[in-house]
């Protein structure tokens, strides 16, 4: 009889969990929760919000593997990517669907980072339209895992491929966009003033993209310069004894064009160095700024909250939280400093290019004067001068737009 009652209770619990499977646990947008694990993923500490949402008793959570809250809707690819990044000593962020003890689900946007002796994860409630997109993506990846028997690593490769097909360069690009989107959605929902440092970092990224596009445009335009020089020399040959002045002008044009090309190459190098360095990456800057702000709020909530911990445990966890906040804050500060240094270099290089372009203008004037002097004998140069004028104007316009953008770039950084 006792065995039958236990079986009945087990069946009742199973049915209750099944009934709750499509119900969402209450996770308020103004809440944040954290958990800290050892290097194996065993839970060592957490706050009261985590235990309430997960519906597990505090004693049951301590010492339990973090996968105790894993939802069956989550593809293994996501966890492979998370662990692969964490083992490399790098933080990672992303969407995760968790399962409460009752069977209810709750979505989180997690910021996870290595800490001394393990890992610390902070979660906020995702509310942007990105969540629906990611939920569908996870369903697709999960289906492939089950139908094709993909290993977690191969599934992660498919996940990254899908992310690239969505228009992102890589996971860094994706997570920066996702975190910023969720962070700003949360800030707006809570009625907070815009986070100026983040807004400016986004503008800087947009400015850099525009500058890189203009550099490519100028590079293409300068490639035509060799054709103009060749045509000048060909026209000079036709002039016979009167060719000396045109030859000299074409040589000067060639020299100045070479200086401009060198300046553009150095500018490209500055932009390339900025995009490949660790903490001058604009996308990473945005992640760091969001993470720093989130951690500051977690620390404040922890200090003011009534957590299920002894005084000794509170002091220990406070150190973990403050250290991670300091790490994110220091790295975001370093990133802003790198942006300021890059900005100074970019503006300096552009100013030099503007001066060099004035020299090219002088050569164009000389060519026009000499063409007018030669009259009918230099008739073939008229159309060439027109082409050079148009090309010069395009380069000038691109350069001025770059300079204006870089100036706004500088103002945004200074305001940060």
Segments (PLM) and residue ranges:
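Acidic, serine/threonine- and proline-rich intrinsically disordered appendage/tail regions
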Residues: 311-315
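Intrinsically disordered, low-complexity acidic Ser/Thr-rich regulatory segments
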Residues: 316-340
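Sensory/regulatory domains in signal-transduction proteins
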Residues: 7, 12-143, 200, 205-207, ...
């Amino acid at each position: 009889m006792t065995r039958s009652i236990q079986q009945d209770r087990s069946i009742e619990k199973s049915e209750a969990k099944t009934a709750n499977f499509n119900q969402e646990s209450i996770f308020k947008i103004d809440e944040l929760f954290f958990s800290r694990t050892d290097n194996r993923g065993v839970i060592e500490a957490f706050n009261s919000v985590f235990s309430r949402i997960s519906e597990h008793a505090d004693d049951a959570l301590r010492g339990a593997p973090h996968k105790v809250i894993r939802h069956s809707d989550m593809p293994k690819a996501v966890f492979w990517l998370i662990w692969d990044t964490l083992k490399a000593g790098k933080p990672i962020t992303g969407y995760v669907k968790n399962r409460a003890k009752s069977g209810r689900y709750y979505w989180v946007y997690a910021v996870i980072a290595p800490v001394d002796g393990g890992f610390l994860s902070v979660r906020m409630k995702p509310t942007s339209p990105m969540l629906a997109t990611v939920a569908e993506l996870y369903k697709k990846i999960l289906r492939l895992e089950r139908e094709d028997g993909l290993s977690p690593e191969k599934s992660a490769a498919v996940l990254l491929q899908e992310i690239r097909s969505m228009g992102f360069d890589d996971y860094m690009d994706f997570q920066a966009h996702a975190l910023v989107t969720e962070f700003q959605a949360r800030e707006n929902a809570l009625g907070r003033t815009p986070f100026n440092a983040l807004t400016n970092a986004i503008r800087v990224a947009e400015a850099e993209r525009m500058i890189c596009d203009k550099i490519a445009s100028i590079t293409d335009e300068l490639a035509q310069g060799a054709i103009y020089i060749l045509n000048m020399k060909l026209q000079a040959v036709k002039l016979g004894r009167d060719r000396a002045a045109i030859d000299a002008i074409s040589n000067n044009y060639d020299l100045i064009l070479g200086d401009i090309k060198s300046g553009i190459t150095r500018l490209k190098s500055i932009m390339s160095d900025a995009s490949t360095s660790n903490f001058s990456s604009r996308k990473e800057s945005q992640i760091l700024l969001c993470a720093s702000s989130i951690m500051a709020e977690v620390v404040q909530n922890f200090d003011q909250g009534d957590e299920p911990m002894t005084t000794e445990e509170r002091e220990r966890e406070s150190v973990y939280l403050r250290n991670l906040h300091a790490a994110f804050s220091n790295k975001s500060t370093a990133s802003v400093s790198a942006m300021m240094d890059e900005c100074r270099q970019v503006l300096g290089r552009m100013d030099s290019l503007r001066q060099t372009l004035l020299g090219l203008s002088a050569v164009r004037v000389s060519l026009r004067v000499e063409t007018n002097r030669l009259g009918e004998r230099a008739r073939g140069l008229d159309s060439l001068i027109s082409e050079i004028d148009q090309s010069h104007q395009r380069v000038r316009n691109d350069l001025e737009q770059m300079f204006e953008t870089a100036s706004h770039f500088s103002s945004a950084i200074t305001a940060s």
